[in-house]
Amino acid sequence: MKMVPRLAVRAWPLCGLLLAALGCVCASGPRTLVLLDNLNVRDTHSLFFRSLKDRGFELTFKTADDPSLSLIKYGEFLYDNLIIFSPSVEDFGGNINVETISAFIDGGGSVLVAASSDIGDPLRELGSECGIEFDEEKTAVIDHHNYDVSDLGQHTLIVADTENLLKAPTIVGKSSLNPILFRGVGMVADPDNPLVLDILTGSSTSYSFFPDKPITQYPHAVGRNTLLIAGLQARNNARVIFSGSLDFFSDAFFNSAVQKAAPGAQRYSQTGNYELAVALSRWVFKEEGVLRVGPVSHHRVGETAPPNAYTVTDLVEYSIVIEQLSNGKWVPFDGDDIQLEFVRIDPFVRTFLKRKGGKYSVQFKLPDVYGVFQFKVDYNRLGYTHLYSSTQVSVRPLQHTQYERFIPSAYPYYASAFSMMAGLFLFSVVFLHMKEKEKSD
């Protein structure tokens, strides 16, 4: 009877453990670090954190000054997402600082930041890095015309109308929302930063100032320039959201009734905070609005394979597959404004792609110009990741055997040449056969 070596017998349990561990790693969701002022925030904002856990996020809760904090180890990011619910932090613990968080964003990480009137310098510096400027500490957004009936008299418990939301369903959700309850610090966007998104703005009667002091100078933010929630999508598709209110994500604001303190104002049994918070988290953590390029093909019409080089004026067909991430699965993207450019230095052809089946395609005639060209799709729309595809091809001139023998526009020149030849022939015949008469004596 053949004996099995002891080493092989012992190796089987070890392999099983390794496979089990690998399965656990693969099954885990996006790794998310949550920084809190204190761990009590985990209980006061439990509904928001529960919505993340229900969607498969792996949350790690730590205080913002924990000395063991680290985002990067051996050049690798330890987390996919970062949530900062610690507005009053003065110094992050461990290896985390504003520069580290900026590097995390530059590496494609997603960050959700919630501030308050007790905002510390680190969040202010982080906002400046992203084109957002917070107002001073102890200031708040004030609106004497759009405050809640439960406000204590300072008019800082703001009722924000959904008309002030950014018109981008991918970011703020597609369903209609009840009014939003907000209490926190105001922000303004850097006008020189085109990447900043004004997700939720104050009304025309809002402003940001110290609620317990008389106004002696022009407020930091006034009217619709007052940002309550702002976003940013970097050129590397990293996403960041800044909320001026930590209470915006709290269970108390999620479950609170809302009614403006104005005669005849409608009362709502619940705010729209929860729905908006979930929609914002889905966008910032790249569950929504994520596009990718699938297979790309191009060939002459009537053929199936791309040639080594195209010829000027060829009729070609270009196809591209574009997919969108939806509920964790890649599905065909539905868009009617995707354009294709055929570019050498400048575009020679720009045309819309039409959806056909699960891909987008178009047929067009190549320009009568030879050189090195690119099929280019550059799709950049609000709320979606930047989609870019470029395929380089060569376009050569006609071979000498491919030119037309006779060009219609040259028929007059042909006629003049042949008529000249015929005239010369007739003249030659007449001249050669003409004989002078002999003179008589």
Swiss-Prot record:
The chain crosses the membrane at residues 413-432. Pathway: Protein modification; protein glycosylation. It is a single-pass type I membrane protein. Residues 29-412 are lumenal. It holds the Pfam family OST48_N. One of its GO terms (molecular function) is enzyme activator activity. GO terms for cellular component: intracellular membrane-bounded organelle; oligosaccharyltransferase complex; oligosaccharyltransferase complex A; oligosaccharyltransferase complex B; plasma membrane. InterPro entries: DDOST_48_kDa_subunit, OST48_MD, OST48_N. Residues 1-28 form the signal peptide. Residues 433-441 are cytoplasmic. It is found in: Endoplasmic reticulum membrane. PANTHER family: DOLICHYL-DIPHOSPHOOLIGOSACCHARIDE--PROTEIN GLYCOSYLTRANSFERASE 48 KDA SUBUNIT. Belongs to the DDOST 48 kDa subunit family. This is Dolichyl-diphosphooligosaccharide--protein glycosyltransferase 48 kDa subunit.
